[in-house]
């Protein structure tokens, strides 16, 4: 795996992971740091639309379909009978950037911040996981690691950038 700075955002469902990643991308790119994201999906997903040419290519058996336009390109790789690739296998497919924010991949070994909302009714992951370096919560918590207000995007960005060496 090439040298890439990676930082994760993990937490139980409905604890604000995606919203935090979204705000962090805006905040960090606004500071001149290039960012890509990697999102783990626990379910089948499809970026394509039935009936479109690219969908027809995939349904006909194409292993990969590369869709390009003047605005963006997207590569769809069909796993078929292959096992799900790990995080490191996917990271090498990204173009070089300063930082990759990863949403999900709780059990991977990279450093992470956990999102926590009291209303979600779930316990914290952090106490049993040393890779979780901080928690972003909507309620005050007493922990053995930094705790941020979930809405303190600037403070969380400062922490992450410091953690990865910026």
Regions found by a protein language model. Give the residues of each.
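Phosphate-binding P-loop
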Residues: 1-4
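Glycine-rich phosphate-binding P-loop
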Residues: 7-29
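Fold-independent oxyanion-binding glycine-rich loops
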Residues: 12, 40-41, 50, 69-70, ...
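N-terminal phosphate/diphosphate-binding loop that engages ATP/GTP or pyrophosphate donors
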Residues: 23-88
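A generic local secondary-structure boundary/capping motif
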Residues: 25, 91, 122-125
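Phosphate-binding/switch loop-helix module in NTP-utilizing enzymes
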Residues: 78-105
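Phosphate/Mg2+-binding loops and adjacent switch elements
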Residues: 99-166
């Amino acid at each position: 795996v090439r040298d890439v700075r990676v930082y994760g955002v993990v937490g139980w469902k409905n604890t604000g992971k995606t919203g935090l990643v979204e705000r962090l991308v805006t905040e960090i790119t606004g500071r001149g740091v290039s960012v890509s994201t990697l999102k783990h999906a626990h379910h089948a997903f499809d970026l394509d639309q039935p009936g479109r040419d690219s969908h027809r290519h995939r349904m006909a058996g194409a292993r990969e379909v590369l869709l390009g336009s003047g605005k963006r390109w997207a590569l769809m790789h069909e796993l078929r009978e292959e096992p799900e690739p790990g995080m490191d296998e996917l990271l090498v497919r990204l173009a070089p950037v300063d930082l990759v924010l990863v949403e999900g991949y709780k059990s991977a070994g990279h450093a992470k911040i956990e999102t926590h909302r009291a209303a979600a009714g779930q316990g914290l992951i952090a106490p049993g996981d040393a890779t979780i370096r901080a928690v972003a919560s909507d309620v005050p918590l007493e922990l053995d690691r930094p705790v941020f207000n979930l809405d303190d995007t600037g403070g969380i960005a400062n922490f992450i950038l410091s953690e990865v060496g910026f």
